Regions:
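A short, N-terminal "cap"/entry segment at the start of jelly-roll beta-barrel domains
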Residues: 1-42, 47-49, 116, 121-123
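Residues that act as N-cap/strand-start positions at coil-to-secondary-structure junctions
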Residues: 14-16, 51-52, 77, 85
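Short, surface-exposed charged micro-motifs
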Residues: 20, 57, 90
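Ligand-binding loop in jelly-roll beta-barrel domains
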Residues: 27, 87-112
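A short, sequence-level motif marking secondary-structure junctions
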Residues: 35-38, 80-84, 106
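A short, polar/proline- and glycine-enriched secondary-structure boundary/capping micro-motif
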Residues: 41-43, 78-79, 110-113
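Short, conserved beta-strand element in jelly-roll/cupin
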Residues: 50-67
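Short acidic-glycine-tyrosine-enriched beta hairpin
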Residues: 69-88
Length: 123
């Protein structure tokens, strides 16, 4: 099964922040556009340890993103780099970033449902 990125269902559409999300079997795929100056921490509040609980594997298509891990380490992933971010992370950006990530459905769905609740409460 193949799906064009633009045909993936929109998960988040908040100004310059847009994610598309699709579940395929036991894995989920997210295409994300995150603006410069973003801090994902507020979106993660209420999840265990206020961090994303899904591991992700993916590639940065444009820009860069800083990932803060539960152990206190911070890494920057840049255009053209593939990555694995273990569960227990949050993210910030200095510049806009576009990436595609894959992860297990259960954990990816947890973020999906949580962030929808966060934005619904803000409306």
């Amino acid at each position: 099964m193949a799906t064009p990125v633009d045909a993936m269902p929109i998960e988040i559409d908040q100004g310059e922040l847009q994610t598309r999300y699709l579940e395929l079997g036991d894995m989920a795929i997210r295409h994300a556009r995150v603006p410069a100056g973003s801090d994902m921490s507020p979106l993660l509040q209420g999840l265990p340890d206020d961090r994303c609980q899904s591991p992700h594997w993916g590639i940065i298509l444009e820009g860069s993103i800083h990932i803060a891990h539960a152990d206190g380490s911070v890494e920057t992933t840049r255009t053209g780099e593939v990555y694995h971010w273990p569960a227990g992370h949050t993210a910030t950006t200095d510049e806009s970033v576009v990436f595609i990530e894959v992860g297990p459905v259960e954990q990816m769905r947890q973020f999906n449902e949580h962030v929808r609740q966060v934005f619904a409460a803000a409306d």
